[in-house]
Amino acid sequence: MASAPAGVSRAFWSLVTSESLGELTILDVGTGTGRVGWALAPLARHVIAVDRDAGAIDEARRRAAAAGLVNVECVVGDVETSEYTAFGPDLITAHLCMSDAIVERAARALVPGRVFAFVAFHTDQWRETGRPSRFAYDEARARRVLTAAGFAVEHLEVEQEVQRFASVEEALAAAIGLAERWKSDGRWFHYVRFLEEGGRTLTRSHLIVKARRT
């Protein structure tokens, strides 16, 4: 079995690759530069990678060409507003790109028995900022949304890593890459206040899910 690409959950990878992929068309929604899709391409019949960021899709095309992948297709599209049915997917993946709209579109595109596997932000992601992402799910909400859309949840787990810091300076340095985004939405202020009040952690928390269309 091929190993998970760098930065991709091994649990998620195992859930996807435990399926017989050889004759399947895989749709990777919110693909970015194709990290997950291109790693799956050698295992599948065809991979379609969709993202609304045209620059990311251009980079995905370059990476596919450099890797010599001939069974892949790149599409610029908004995965929250476009339908997936025309792609004819047999399996759908989403890595840190998740919303109720994506679940609903995946359900409409997959025939019974086919799999939707994803990694989503968990509501504990960066909990120290005092503001969960609007794209974050807890376990109960994920099950509820999937069941309502017509999926049976086969696997659901939370992967969590809590970084611990010796000082405020160390904690701020670890989050510096997020500073601009957090300053724009108020999360930076809350994180700094958390540190000033004695907090010394930063939590990464992801939800790993495999669901099958009923």
Predicted features by range, described:
Residues 80-91:
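A short acidic, Gly/Pro-enriched loop at the edge of an enzyme's catalytic core
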Residues 102-115:
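A short glycine-rich, Lys/Arg-flanked "PGG" loop and its adjoining helix->strand segment in the class I
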Residues 3-24:
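Conserved alpha-helix/loop element of class I SAM-dependent methyltransferases that forms part
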Residues 24-30, 115-141:
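Conserved class I S-adenosyl-L-methionine
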Residues 157-214:
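Conserved Class I S-adenosyl-L-methionine
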Residues 90-103:
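A short SAM/SAH-binding and catalytic strip from SAM-dependent methyltransferases
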Residues 35-81:
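Class I SAM-dependent methyltransferase SAM/SAH-binding core
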